[in-house]
């Protein structure tokens, strides 16, 4: 009987007649629709078996695993990453070749595992919280901004609006990109570092555009290059530990106008494009998309005429006013001294700068400074020399401090004139401006 079945039934025809009732189900179990031809995973990494990811997790189906046993722990960590399965397939495929250049490949995996994929810092309040809690939070926002820097009320209102937008949208939409336009030393960085970053409880990473000479600084070098590393954007995410930090690009107008400078601007244009920045790729991690859509990008510059028109069109520019002499006096006595005291080892009140003395320093020693950067430098110089003198005692050389090292010390004009080398500071400022 079995012989007749084998003789009479052609290979394919017999099976079809035998399983007529299952025709509609069997193909669905064995076949899957062909992948789209423009899918980069299938262009560069052909996957003939639709269950390949399951095989990479459990082996090849015959109890074998292509990943060497000594890298099983690394494999498990990769499988836990918040990445799409197709991207995990691509990452796991690299494990097969680790031994060809072990140190370099392992470093690649270690850095990849440090990227905070889909890990977000939570907003301090939500729009569904109790109204009293929300109100208290925004009271704290105003207090934090006022403690960060003096004045700039219009700028602070813009930042409060920015924070409110993040709260109301629950950070699901990218808020407009803020750019601070103002003279050097007017407090742009302080307002962001001690203001916005503290209000949102998010880490902030600073990038000085004046020091960037190549776009690879931002988006890395290809893994194939010797000594290659990821760029500053990925390193910033790793350092901050979340995928929605604040990235502050200072001195945007210092980017060169050479071809390298244009490449740098193009990277920044890509970063700020809400259509593209959810698929940012570092050259070091080629093929691994990194979502930057939740990152808060903020820029600062002095000369608006040097900004790329395309990039400028995407920025909400806030003008930072130059402080008046009276505003500088308040900034010096209420803010700069309090910031410097603990850095040098003084308690608040050990060294006293009256408003009259602060005005004297401003008008006589840094009258050409539009911001307060030099004012801060002079206050720091005075404090450092007093700090040294109190340890040296009678051997110290400053006549204005003789017999006056009992705290609290009140600064007078003689001390300012002796402790601040006006000619040296003016010379330093002259040479500094040559390179701005």
Language-model features: where?
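C-terminal engagement/docking regions of AAA+ P-loop ATPases
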Residues: 373, 378-436
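Conserved C-terminal "switch" segment of AAA+ ATPases
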Residues: 80-84, 241, 303-313, 317-377, ...
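AAA+/P-loop NTPase substrate/partner-engagement loops
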Residues: 198-228, 236, 327
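Pre-Walker A (pre-P-loop) alpha-helix and adjacent loop at the N terminus of AAA/AAA+ ATPase modules
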Residues: 88-121, 131-181, 233, 386
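AAA+/SF3 P-loop NTPase mechanochemical coupling elements
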Residues: 240-244, 280-300, 349-353, 405-411
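N-terminal accessory segments that target, anchor, or regulate ATP-driven/P-loop NTPase machines
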Residues: 1-115
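Conserved catalytic/switch belt of AAA+ P-loop NTPases
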Residues: 253-290
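Walker A/P-loop
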Residues: 171-209, 238
């Amino acid at each position: 009987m079995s012989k007749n079945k084998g003789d009479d039934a052609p290979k394919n025809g017999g099976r079809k007649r035998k399983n007529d009732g299952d025709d509609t189900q069997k193909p669905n179990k064995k076949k899957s629709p062909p992948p789209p031809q423009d899918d980069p995973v299938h262009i560069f990494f052909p996957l003939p078996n639709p269950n390949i990811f399951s095989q990479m997790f459990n082996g090849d189906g015959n109890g074998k695993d292509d990943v060497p046993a000594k890298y099983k722990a690394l494999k498990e960590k990769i499988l836990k990453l918040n990445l799409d399965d197709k991207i995990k397939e691509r990452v796991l495929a690299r494990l097969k070749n680790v031994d060809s250049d072990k140190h370099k490949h392992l470093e690649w995996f270690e850095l990849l595992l440090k990227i905070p994929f889909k890990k977000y810092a939570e907003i301090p309040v939500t729009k569904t919280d109790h109204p009293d809690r929300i109100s208290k939070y925004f009271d704290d926002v105003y207090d934090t901004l006022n403690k960060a820097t003096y004045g700039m009320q219009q700028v602070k209102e813009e930042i409060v609006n920015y924070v409110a937008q993040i709260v109301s949208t629950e950070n699901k939409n990218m808020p407009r990109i803020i750019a601070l336009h103002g003279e050097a030393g007017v407090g742009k960085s302080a307002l962001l570092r001690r203001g916005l970053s503290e209000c949102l409880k998010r880490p902030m990473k600073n990038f000085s555009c004046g020091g960037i000479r190549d776009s690879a600084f931002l988006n890395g070098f290809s893994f194939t290059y010797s000594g290659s590393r990821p760029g500053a954007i990925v390193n910033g995410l790793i350092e901050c530990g979340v995928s929605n930090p604040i990235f502050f690009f200072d001195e945007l107008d210092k980017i060169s106008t050479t071809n390298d400078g244009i490449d740098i601007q193009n990277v920044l244009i890509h970063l700020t494009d809400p259509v593209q920045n959810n698929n940012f790729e570092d050259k070091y991690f080629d093929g691994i998309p990194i979502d930057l859509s939740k990152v808060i990008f903020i820029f600062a510059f002095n000369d608006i005429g040097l900004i790329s028109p395309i990039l400028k069109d995407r920025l909400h520019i806030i003008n930072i006013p130059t402080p008046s002499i009276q505003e500088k006096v308040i900034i010096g006595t209420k803010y700069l001294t309090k910031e410097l005291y603990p850095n040098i080892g003084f308690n608040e009140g050990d060294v006293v700068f009256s408003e009259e003395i602060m005005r004297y320093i401003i008008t006589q020693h840094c009258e050409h400074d539009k911001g307060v950067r030099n004012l801060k430098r002079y206050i720091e110089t005075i404090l450092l020399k007093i700090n040294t003198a109190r340890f040296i005692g009678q051997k110290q050389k400053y006549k204005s401090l003789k017999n006056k090292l009992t705290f609290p010390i009140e600064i007078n004009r003689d001390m300012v004139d002796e402790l601040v080398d006006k000619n040296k500071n003016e010379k330093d400022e002259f040479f500094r401006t040559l390179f701005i």
